[in-house]
C-alpha cells in the first residue's frame, strides 16, 4: 500500500473518530458549557430545542452562547429523531418534572418495525409514550397515552419530524377495548412487570385475560387489547419481556394460548440482553409479530436471535456501537460514514424472505436474487406450556437434541431419584449454608448460620452425593456434596439432584463438563431479568452414558479430598 493511500485512510479514521465522539458526547459537552456559563437547566433545554427548530432564542441567552451551541450541533451526524430522543431523555425529567425515560424504545428497533409496514395504511400505538415506535411510518397514525405531560413531547416530535398523527390523551385499557375502530397495524411496547398491575374490576372484566380476577399485569392486558384492535389480517408488533414468553405460570400460559388458538404467530425476534439499558432497565425482551388470521393446525414460525442493535449496552448512556475491521479500524459505507454494529437489518432481510416464501400478506418485502437462510420452528414443536422463548427452537439446540436422540441417550431424569424432596422444617439451632457465592466449581465452602439468620433462599436440605447445579443463565456453576454433614442446606438458586447410585453420580458428573449439557441448560432458561432453569426442565436434559468412567471417578475422589481440606481450613 502506498504512503499516500495509508495516510488517506488514517485521515478518514481520525475524522470518523471525531464524528463518533461528537455523536456520543455532544449533549454532555453542550450541557457542561451552558452550566459553566450559568444557564439554568430548563433554559438549556429551550436553547437547544430553539436552535433545532430554527427559532429565535437570543432572548434566553447571549449571541455568543447561541453561536457556540449552533456550531456544536452542526457537527452531529445522526438522525433527527435520534437527536430528539437523546435530548428528551437528557432533559425531559427536569423539563416536565417527571421521570420519562421509561417511554423510550431504541431507534434501531423502531426503524426495524417501521421498515416492515406498508405505507398508507392505518396504525395505532395504544401505549405510545413519545411515539417512537411509529416515528418513520408514512400512514394514518393514531397515538394514545394516558400521561398528558408525555404527550406534550409526542406532539412536538411528530410535528417537527413532519410525521402527522392523531394523538389522544386516554386510558387505552378502558377506552379502546370496546372501540369499533380497527387498524392494519398495532405496535406496542407496554408497561410490564409484576409491579405494573391493575386491580380495577371495571377494566379487568373487559378482558378475557382479566375476567373474574382480582388483579392482572397491565402488559398482559395490553397484548389482548393490541390483538383486538386489529382488522382482519392486521398485524401486531409487541415488544415483551422474555418472562411473558417462557414463564409457566397460569396467566402467561393463558396469554400465549390466546395467541396460538385465535391468531397466527408469524415471528419472534429475540433482542439482546439490556436492549433497554438506555431506559434504565435490564429486562430481556423479544418482538412478537402476530397476525389476525385464523391459525392453521400447524405452521412455521420465524425466529431470529439478534445480538447487537447498534448501541454499547453495557456502558453509561449506551453510546453508539460501530462495526470494526480485524485491524481495529471502523467499517465505513461508500460515503465514509461508520456503519452501526447492528443485526436488525439482517433480521429484516431474513424475515422478508420468510414472509415472501410463506405468502404472508400485509407486510412490506422486496424480491431479491439472494435467498438468505432463516430459522423457524413449527407450532407443533411447542409443549403444553406453549413456550415462545426462542432459545429452545434455535438450530444450535435442535441439532444438539437430534444428536442426543440419534445416539439413544437418556435424560437426567433416568439417573436421579425423582421422588426426592429437598424441603425441610427449620428445627435445628444452626445450619451450614451453600449459596452460589460459596461454590467455586466444583468445590464448595458452606457458611454457618444460626436458625433465625438462615437466608430465606436456603430451601434445600442436601446430603452426601447430591449434585447442585446453578439455575442461572451464563456460566454454569456446580458442585458435588462430598461429606456427611448434619443440617447442610443449599440455596434454591441451585437445581438439587440426587443420583440413584454411585454409577449415576459419575455419569451425571462427567456430563456437566460437556458442551451438549451447557447448550441444553442455557437454551431452556427462561425469565426477563434473572433467567433461570426450572427444576422440571433440568431433568429433561439428555446425558450420555458412554464416558470414561474411571477417569471421572478418580476426579470425584480428588474433589472429595480437596473439599475436605477446604472446609477444614474454612
Spans of features found by a protein language model:
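Specificity-determining recognition surfaces
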Residues: 364, 375, 381, 514-541
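A short beta-sheet element
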Residues: 464, 470-513
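Class I S-adenosyl-L-methionine
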Residues: 12-31, 37-144, 150-153
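Sequence-specific dsDNA recognition surfaces
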Residues: 413-423, 436-464
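A short glycine-rich beta-alpha junction/loop motif
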Residues: 288, 487-495, 526-552
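Non-catalytic DNA-recognition/assembly elements of restriction-modification systems
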Residues: 349-424, 545-570
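Conserved Class I SAM-dependent methyltransferase catalytic core
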Residues: 214-276, 281-289
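Conserved S-adenosyl-L-methionine
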Residues: 99-188, 193-194, 233, 241-243, ...
Amino acid at each position: 500500500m502506498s504512503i499516500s493511500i495509508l495516510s488517506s485512510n488514517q485521515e478518514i479514521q481520525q475524522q470518523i473518530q471525531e464524528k463518533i465522539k461528537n455523536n456520543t458526547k455532544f449533549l454532555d459537552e453542550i450541557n457542561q458549557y451552558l452550566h459553566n456559563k450559568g444557564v439554568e437547566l430548563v433554559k438549556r433545554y429551550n436553547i437547544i430545542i430553539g436552535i433545532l427548530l430554527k427559532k429565535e432564542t437570543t432572548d434566553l441567552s447571549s449571541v455568543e452562547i447561541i453561536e457556540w451551541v449552533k456550531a456544536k450541533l452542526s457537527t452531529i451526524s445522526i438522525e433527527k429523531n435520534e437527536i430528539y430522543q437523546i435530548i428528551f431523555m437528557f432533559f425531559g425529567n427536569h423539563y416536565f418534572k417527571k421521570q420519562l425515560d421509561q417511554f423510550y424504545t431504541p431507534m434501531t428497533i423502531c426503524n426495524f418495525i417501521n421498515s416492515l409496514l406498508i405505507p398508507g395504511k392505518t396504525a395505532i400505538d395504544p401505549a405510545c409514550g413519545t411515539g417512537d415506535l411509529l416515528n418513520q411510518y408514512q400512514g394514518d397514525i393514531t397515538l394514545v397515552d394516558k400521561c398528558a405531560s408525555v404527550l406534550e413531547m409526542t406532539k412536538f416530535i411528530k410535528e417537527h419530524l413532519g410525521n402527522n398523527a392523531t394523538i389522544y390523551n386516554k386510558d387505552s385499557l378502558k377506552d379502546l377495548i370496546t372501540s369499533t375502530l380497527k387498524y392494519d397495524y398495532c405496535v406496542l411496547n407496554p408497561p410490564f412487570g409484576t409491579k405494573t398491575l391493575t386491580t380495577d374490576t371495571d377494566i379487568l372484566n373487559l378482558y378475557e385475560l382479566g375476567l373474574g380476577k382480582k388483579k392482572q399485569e397491565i402488559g398482559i392486558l395490553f397484548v389482548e387489547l393490541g390483538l383486538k384492535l386489529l382488522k382482519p389480517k392486521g398485524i401486531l408488533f409487541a415488544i415483551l419481556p422474555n418472562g411473558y414468553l417462557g414463564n409457566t405460570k397460569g396467566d402467561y400460559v393463558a396469554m400465549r394460548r390466546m395467541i396460538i388458538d385465535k391468531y397466527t404467530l408469524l415471528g419472534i425476534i429475540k433482542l439482546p440482553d439490556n436492549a433497554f439499558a438506555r431506559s434504565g432497565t435490564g429486562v430481556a425482551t423479544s418482538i412478537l409479530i402476530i397476525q389476525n388470521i385464523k391459525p392453521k393446525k400447524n405452521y412455521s414460525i420465524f425466529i431470529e436471535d439478534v445480538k447487537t442493535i447498534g448501541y454499547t449496552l453495557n456502558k453509561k448512556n449506551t453510546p453508539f456501537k460501530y462495526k470494526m475491521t480485524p485491524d481495529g479500524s471502523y467499517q465505513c459505507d461508500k460515503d465514509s460514514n461508520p456503519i452501526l454494529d447492528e443485526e436488525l437489518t439482517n433480521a429484516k432481510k431474513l424475515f422478508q424472505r420468510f414472509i415472501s416464501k410463506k405468502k404472508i400478506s400485509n407486510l412490506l418485502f422486496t424480491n431479491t436474487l439472494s435467498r438468505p437462510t432463516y430459522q423457524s420452528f413449527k407450532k407443533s414443536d411447542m409443549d403444553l406450556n406453549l413456550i415462545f422463548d426462542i432459545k429452545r427452537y434455535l438450530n444450535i439446540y435442535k441439532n444438539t437434541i437430534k444428536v442426543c436422540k440419534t445416539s439413544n441417550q437418556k435424560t437426567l431424569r433416568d439417573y436421579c431419584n425423582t421422588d426426592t424432596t429437598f424441603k425441610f422444617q427449620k428445627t435445628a439451632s444452626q445450619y451450614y449454608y451453600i449459596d452460589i457465592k460459596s461454590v467455586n466449581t466444583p468445590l464448595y465452602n458452606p457458611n454457618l448460620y444460626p436458625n433465625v439468620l438462615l437466608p430465606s433462599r436456603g430451601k434445600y436440605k442436601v446430603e452426601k452425593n447430591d449434585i447442585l447445579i446453578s439455575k442461572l443463565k451464563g456460566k454454569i456453576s456446580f458442585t458435588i456434596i462430598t461429606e456427611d454433614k448434619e443440617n447442610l442446606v443449599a440455596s434454591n438458586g441451585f437445581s438439587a439432584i440426587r443420583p440413584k447410585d454411585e454409577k449415576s453420580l459419575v455419569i451425571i458428573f462427567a456430563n456437566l463438563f460437556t458442551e451438549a449439557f451447557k447448550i441444553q441448560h442455557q437454551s431452556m432458561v427462561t425469565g426477563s431479568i434473572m433467567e433461570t432453569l426450572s427444576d422440571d426442565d433440568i431433568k429433561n436434559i439428555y446425558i450420555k452414558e458412554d464416558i470414561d468412567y474411571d477417569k471421572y471417578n478418580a476426579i470425584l475422589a480428588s474433589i472429595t479430598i480437596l473439599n475436605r481440606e477446604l472446609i477444614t481450613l474454612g
